[in-house]
Design a protein with these regions (language model features):
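P-loop NTPase switch module centered on the Walker A-proximal segment
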Residues: 1-98, 102-104, 138, 142, ...
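Short hinge/gating elements
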Residues: 6-7, 128, 167-176, 256-264, ...
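Residue-level signature of catalytic and energy-coupling elements of molecular machines
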Residues: 14, 20, 52, 71-73, ...
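Active-site phosphate-binding and catalytic loops of NTP-dependent enzymes
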Residues: 30-57, 80, 146-158, 190-203, ...
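Conserved C-terminal guanine-recognition region of P-loop GTPase G domains, centered on the G4
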Residues: 88, 94-156
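G-domain G4 guanine-recognition motif of GTPases
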Residues: 99-100, 123-137, 162-176, 283, ...
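Conserved catalytic-core segments of large NTP-driven translation/proteostasis enzymes
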Residues: 148-282
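C-terminal effector modules of nucleic-acid-centric enzymes and ribosome-associated factors
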Residues: 261-263, 268-339
């Protein structure tokens, strides 16, 4: 059985989260030496690249020594509260990334509070210590106070701290002595973040996010909590209203590097993507057909944003845009509701 660590990264907008993940990916040698890549690999949605923010959570996976590390990128905004909560359900620990000058910000508090509530183990990374006027020691105190105010347990308050600069590709335990490697962070993840806790019993997996492909339709993503999921087998899909549907797993993928690898079976503790399951919603449980036991649903905060769609009355009306007819707009909006 391979050793797995599932970690989520929490950070305020612009504190360097996506850059840090980029450096981890490069350190684990996913790219060939001569391969071209864009910076901000994780922000692959157009809006995210334009604004430099993370809205949807993405999963990447790196292998370090003999451990598979699944990295789950979380949105840093309270506006995406539902997304945050679902994503943290897949993790066993979190990396809290904080700017060495700005310190913990209000939005960090929201996501960190959710993580501590779920009992996740934190590692604190104080980033950008190369900036002028940075104050790493004060920021460390501020993080401790924040966790204390959020009712962290004694174990959570004994968090491991690393200092560094993701941009300059280093992390270490002493910010006054920079080194030249980001690997101490991966060592800390393997050492301090617990392995997934695996319960005995029949298959259970909660769908915590989804992906969409024009070829195979909706893809269910989640972490296998108990048992295993096998390709080609039939399972029970437990819906919110108590209805249990029979579904068949057509294809099974695990995250490997920036992509996905097709596999025939996924064991408890790993995160996987399933195609072929029709009519699922986020929060549904894929369970054993003979003995379907649904997992508790995730309570999601109500959305904090209202939108109004009106007729375009700008001077460029009808002259630009990819989706211009009402049919196109309807299809595009409906596709968004499937996510």
């Amino acid at each position: 059985m391979q050793s797995i660590r599932n970690i989520a990264i929490i950070a305020h907008v612009d504190h360097g989260k996506t850059t840090l993940v980029d450096k981890i990916i490069h350190a684990s040698k996913i790219f060939r030496e001569n391969q071209q890549f864009e910076d901000l690999i994780l922000d692959n949605n157009d809006l995210e690249r334009e604004r430099g923010i993370t809205i949807l959570s993405k999963n990447v996976s790196v292998r370090y020594k003999d451990t598979k590390i699944n990295i789950i990128d979380t949105p840093g905004h309270a506006d995406f509260g539902g997304e945050v909560e679902r994503v943290l359900k897949m993790a066993d620990g979190v990396i809290l990334l904080v700017d060495a000058f700005e310190g913990p910000m209000p939005q960090t508090r929201f996501v960190l509070g959710k993580a501590l509530e779920l009992g996740l183990t934190p590692i604190v990374v104080i980033n950008k210590v190369d900036k002028e006027n940075c104050r790493p020691d004060e920021v460390h105190e501020a993080v401790f106070e924040l966790m204390f105010n959020l009712d962290a347990t004694e174990e959570q308050l004994e968090f491991h701290t690393l200092y560094g600069s993701a941009k300059n590709n280093w992390m270490g335990e002493d910010w006054k002595n920079p080194n030249d490697s980001i690997l101490p962070l991966l060592d800390a993840v393997v050492k301090y973040i617990p392995e997934p806790k695996i319960d005995e019993g029949s298959t259970q997996m909660q769908i915590t996010s989804l992906d969409f492909s024009n070829f195979v339709g909706r893809i269910a993503i989640g972490r296998v909590k108990r048992g295993s999921i096998k390709e080609g087998q039939q399972y029970a899909l437990c819906k919110e209203d108590g209805v249990v549907k029979r579904v068949k797993v057509k294809e099974l993928h695990v995250f490997e590097g920036l992509g996905k690898n097709k596999v025939t079976e996924v064991q408890a503790g790993d995160i996987c993507a399933i195609t072929g399951v029709e009519g699922f919603d986020i929060g549904d449980t894929i369970a054993d057909l003979e003995n379907p036991e649904p997992l508790d649903r995730i309570s999601i905060d109500e959305p904090t944003m209202n939108m109004l769609f009106t007729i375009n009355n700008s001077p460029f009306f009808g002259k630009e845009g990819k989706f211009v007819t009402s049919r196109h707009l309807r299809e595009r909006l409906m596709k968004e509701t499937e996510k």
